[in-house]
């Protein structure tokens, strides 16, 4: 409905359709809308499909001046309900896929624009929803202006849709994440008043660059909002729907506007294509697994066989450092259960310490995955990796690990594959285990140091571990404990 009506509106600026043709289109669209009004079930209440369906009905009602009929009142009521239950308090769509979140936002913006064009007041729930999703887009936007390829998402520029949010709401903070002027795409979407007023909206940058979207479990650690800024996205939230992937404890890393560590994308929805499940699995994300077992499992294109339960996240952001941690219960079913936990300490502007902690009492094999952007070349040097792109990053570990590099495929755009690399590390250990990974653009030295009690007794690494990082002329001591500190 929406595309038909938008096409008609464009042509009607310079062309008059004959009555017979217009009647034919109306009958066809009405027949479709009658079905959309009648077919509405639990799936559509929760799915992005339902939002698209109701927005099409509302657009139909506006164009044909049917706002006093069920074609308008029923879908508007349904849409209000959908916005309340599909959009989390932090502005993220519950299906955990930015691509589909923004399909929903596109349609909601279309409805709001129709309200303006037809001199109706935009309902408050629409403004709230546009604001919530717009701000979550601003939080997730990389220095390259693209969304992370979370779930079933492509490498898509977010500036145009954020620009439309800013224009409709007259929001200067959202404008800072969009274009300074209305872009070509948005000219076709917005009403004339919003386009005219956009230059007068003052641009306001957020006070703090790092942002926590707590309800969805998405955290964004930054040193600035500039194109040459540093960015880390950490994910530890619900899997969402069939669009969700096994990305618990995953992180993206972008240094000076260049992608280094990424989500591998989606590629296809074809049931029998093995790449579909391959890109949904744990190893296509920068996370950890235990004993070669996947913490979440999938079947065919849409089936979720098992989904690990995420635990509550904790974060602390300030001007000097950012910290975030998360965990999940995906390995409680092992004969000897394990609780994986990841802690990320970002010492601004350009040092990242990744702590992978595994609480258990038995012996297990622990594996880390690091999936690289297709423009990054990795090289193994002793117990470290050099990542080479336009910039260079050094990755080093506190322990001697088995490190290998594998050829993989990633997908930045639907139906397209790119060749890339995956770094895999393996570590066999008994009891509570901590693996520390340090990443910096400057070469550095890392060494384990002893942890002792007040009586000078040595503390076992199963209980606590510390490292010393020598960087430039500085020494950084980093400590992690797997047990509660007591008076022993």
Q: Can you name each region flagged by the protein language model?
A:
Residues 47, 154, 160, 171-181, ...:
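CBM-like, beta-strand-rich accessory domains located in the C-terminal region of large
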Residues 239, 248, 262-280:
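Extended active-site and interfacial segments that coordinate phosphate-rich ligands
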Residues 229-232, 242-244, 261-263, 270-272, ...:
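Short helix/loop capping segments that flank catalytic or ligand/cofactor-binding pockets
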């Amino acid at each position: 409905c929406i595309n038909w009506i938008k096409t008609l509106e464009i042509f009607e600026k310079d062309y008059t359709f004959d009555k017979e043709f217009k009647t034919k289109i109306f009958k066809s669209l009405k027949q479709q809308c009658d079905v959309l009004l009648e077919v509405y079930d639990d799936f559509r209440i929760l799915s992005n499909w339902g939002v698209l369906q109701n927005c099409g009905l509302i657009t139909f009602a506006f164009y044909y001046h049917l706002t006093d009929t069920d074609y308008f009142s029923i879908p508007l009521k349904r849409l209000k309900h959908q916005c309340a239950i599909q959009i989390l308090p932090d502005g993220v769509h519950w299906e955990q896929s930015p691509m589909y979140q923004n399909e929903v936002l596109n349609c909601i913006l279309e409805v709001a624009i129709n309200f303006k064009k037809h001199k109706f007041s935009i309902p408050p729930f629409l403004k709230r929803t546009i604001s919530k999703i717009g701000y979550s887009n601003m939080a997730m936007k990389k220095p390259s202006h693209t969304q992370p390829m979370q779930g079933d998402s492509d490498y898509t520029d977010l500036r145009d849709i954020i620009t439309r949010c800013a224009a409709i709401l007259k929001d200067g903070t959202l404008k800072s994440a969009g274009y300074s002027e209305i872009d070509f795409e948005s000219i076709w979407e917005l009403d004339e008043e919003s386009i005219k007023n956009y230059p007068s909206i003052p641009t306001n940058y957020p006070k703090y660059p790092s942002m926590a979207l707590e309800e969805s479990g998405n955290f964004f650690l930054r040193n600035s909002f500039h194109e040459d800024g540093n960015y880390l996205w950490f994910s530890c939230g619900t899997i969402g729907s069939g669009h969700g992937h096994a990305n618990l404890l995953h992180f993206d890393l972008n240094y000076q506007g260049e992608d280094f560590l990424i989500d591998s994308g989606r590629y296809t929805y074809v049931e029998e294509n093995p790449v579909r499940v391959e890109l949904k699995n744990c190893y296509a994300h920068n996370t950890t697994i235990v004993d070669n077992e996947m913490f979440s499992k999938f079947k065919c294109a849409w089936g979720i066989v098992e989904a690990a339960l995420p635990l509550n996240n904790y974060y602390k952001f300030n001007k000097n450092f950012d910290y975030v941690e998360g965990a999940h219960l995906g390995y409680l079913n092992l004969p000897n259960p394990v609780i994986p936990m990841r802690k990320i300490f970002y010492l601004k502007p350009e040092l990242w310490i990744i702590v992978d902690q595994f609480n258990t009492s038995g012996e297990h094999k622990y594996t880390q995955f690091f999936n690289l952007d297709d423009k990054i070349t990795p090289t193994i040097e002793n117990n470290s990796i050099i990542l080479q792109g336009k910039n260079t990053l050094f990755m080093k570990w506190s322990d001697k690990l088995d490190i290998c590099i594998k050829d993989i495929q990633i997908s930045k755009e639907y139906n397209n594959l790119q060749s890339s690399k995956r770094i895999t590390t393996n570590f066999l250990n008994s009891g509570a285990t901590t693996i520390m990974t340090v990443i910096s653009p400057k070469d550095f030295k890392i060494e384990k140091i002893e942890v002792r009690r007040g009586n000078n007794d040595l503390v076992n690494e199963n209980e606590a571990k510390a490292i010393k990082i020598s960087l430039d002329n500085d020494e950084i001591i980093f400590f992690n404990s797997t047990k509660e500190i007591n008076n022993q």
